[in-house]
């Protein structure tokens, strides 16, 4: 019904505009109006996240929608706050909490309000905290890449949703949903559900259309193929990890394109959007990967594998890592099957 009303409003608006504009301006106005109408019609035809989640368990839908609401609020805070590495300032110049703490609080508040979350844990506060609900438990990194936010680079949020009330003694194989939000020129969330194939992208509509403020499905990621694109994290490890050094040299000799932003969320997101490439963050004798399995490694592995790629900690899928503590870390590679297998062959698990 909502879509029917939107279509009628858009068509009537276009008709009334064209009916009253005359002379040389009419053709130009007509073209602009037609483009606007097509834009609105296309948006109105796309499923909202609420509609898309109708296939999910009711409590999983509530937990997932809580994350979408939180990410919408975080997107607004990022765009309207002036931040440095220590604190943020609102539009009135008042000092606030650092933006990653603000994001942390927003997510906890939304998860508590959902009634569908028993336990939640954040990378900022790596404890298992009761949320007062039941059904699922959520682990999240509230603002991945926050160290580069003052430079206005893209940053993101990562989360995973497990059944039950605990977040240790589990693995990524038990995930029921996972998602990443990208706060860049556009705000998008890519999410995957246990009972649906593929990973699905939603766009936060923030223009002046009738769909303003809604999350609209815009893409579906089904395959990650071969392509010469790589995003190498922890490059210092090439100095004392011969396998990583050899792998990096392979990329250079074969003219791969370097696409590394300093944030794992946008780097992984580009692999799904482009449908090719590989991201890795590797251990060595002196430098260990800081990626936490619960908050980052497992949820992104879930998204990548749902999108048709592979993940690996050097020997096996990152989804098979047993999560024994909230602070457990691991090296990882995500991307096209052949690239991840090359990572396993050259890097392996020697420095795990």
Region locations from a protein language model:
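IMPase-like, lithium-sensitive Mg2+-dependent phosphomonoesterase catalytic core
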Residues: 38-90, 95, 101-352
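Proteolytic processing junctions in secreted/extracellular precursors
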Residues: 19, 31-38, 43
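N-terminal chloroplast transit peptides
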Residues: 1-28
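Intrinsically disordered, low-complexity, compositionally biased regions/tails
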Residues: 23-27, 36, 313
């Amino acid at each position: 019904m909502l879509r029917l009303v939107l279509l009628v409003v858009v068509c009537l608006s276009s008709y009334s505009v064209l009916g009253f504009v005359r002379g040389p301006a009419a053709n130009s106005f007509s073209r602009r109006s037609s483009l606007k109408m097509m834009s609105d019609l296309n948006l109105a035809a796309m499923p909202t996240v609420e509609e898309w989640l109708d296939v999910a368990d009711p409590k999983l839908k509530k937990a997932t929608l809580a994350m979408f609401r939180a990410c919408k609020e975080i997107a607004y805070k990022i765009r309207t706050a002036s931040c440095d590495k220590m604190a943020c300032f609102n539009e009135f110049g008042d000092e606030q909490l650092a933006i990653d703490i603000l994001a942390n609080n927003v997510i906890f508040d939304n998860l508590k309000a959902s009634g569908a979350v028993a336990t939640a844990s954040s990378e900022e506060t790596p404890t298992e905290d009761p949320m007062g609900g039941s059904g699922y438990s959520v682990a999240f990194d509230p603002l991945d890449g926050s160290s580069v936010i003052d430079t206005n680079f893209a940053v993101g949020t990562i989360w995973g949703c497990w059944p039950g009330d605990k977040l240790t003694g589990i693995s990524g194989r038990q995930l029921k949903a996972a998602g990443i939000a990208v706060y860049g020129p556009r705000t998008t969330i890519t999410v995957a559900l246990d009972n649906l194939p593929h990973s699905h992208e939603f766009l936060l509509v923030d223009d002046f259309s009738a769909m303003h403020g809604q999350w609209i499905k815009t893409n579906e990621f089904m395959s990650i193929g071969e392509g010469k694109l790589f995003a190498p994290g922890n490059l210092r490890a090439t100095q004392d990890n011969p396998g990583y050094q050899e792998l990096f040299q392979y990329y250079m000799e074969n003219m791969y394109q370097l696409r590394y932003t300093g944030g794992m969320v946008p780097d992984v997101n580009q692999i799904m959007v482009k449908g090719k490439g590989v991201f890795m963050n590797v251990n060595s004798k002196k430098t260990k990967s800081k990626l936490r399995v619960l908050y980052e490694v497992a949820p992104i592995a879930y998204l990548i594998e749902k999108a048709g790629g592979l993940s690996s900690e050097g020997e096996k899928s990152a989804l098979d890592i047993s999560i024994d503590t909230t602070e457990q870390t691991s090296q990882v590679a995500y991307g096209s099957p052949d690239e991840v297998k090359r990572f396993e062959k050259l890097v392996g698990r020697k420095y795990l």
